[in-house]
Amino acid sequence: MTTFTHINSQGEANMVDVSAKAETVREARAEAIVTMSKETLAMIVEGKHHKGDVFATARIAGIQAAKRTWELIPLCHPLLLSKVEVNLEPLLETNRVRIQSLCKLTGKTGVEMEALTAVSVAALTIYDMCKAVQKDIVIEQVRLLEKSGGKSGHFVAEEK
């Protein structure tokens, strides 16, 4: 049976010791979906939001969040990320925005939490910038899409 890596033999939370692990190229992709009204999405896409470019702001927020994941998630290691990418795609037919991230490094631990944090904070930034015009925006389906590198192997999520 697989065990929780962040719990020691006394049942206490602790940071995993990665000092003996080999450095490998590690990559993770994540996504989040933000659902809003047709009018709110149109305002964003047409550049008519009074706060400015919502997607550019969300992209930068997601990148910044990935770089600071270790400050937000208590047992995450500080990582020297070599790449962080955040893409936002308006899905006009469903009044949604698909946010996807890619995080990459050569190191001793994975970058899943950084990828998940990137999409989460990008989604929260969209909500923050749009809450004045719509309060019932929904953030959903925050999930890991893919990870590679390390001894746990390659993971690819099932399509939804």
Curated annotation (Swiss-Prot):
Annotated metabolic or biological route of this protein = Cofactor biosynthesis; molybdopterin biosynthesis
What is this enzyme's EC? 4.6.1.17
- State the Gene Ontology terms under molecular function: cyclic pyranopterin monophosphate synthase activity
Which CDD domains does this UniProt record tie to the protein? MoaC_PE
Q: How is this protein organized at the quaternary level?
A: Homohexamer; trimer of dimers.
Family (UniProt):
Belongs to the MoaC family.
Q: Which HAMAP family match?
A: MoaC_B (MF_01224_B)
Name the chain's protein.
Cyclic pyranopterin monophosphate synthase
| Species this chain originates from | Haemophilus influenzae (strain PittEE)
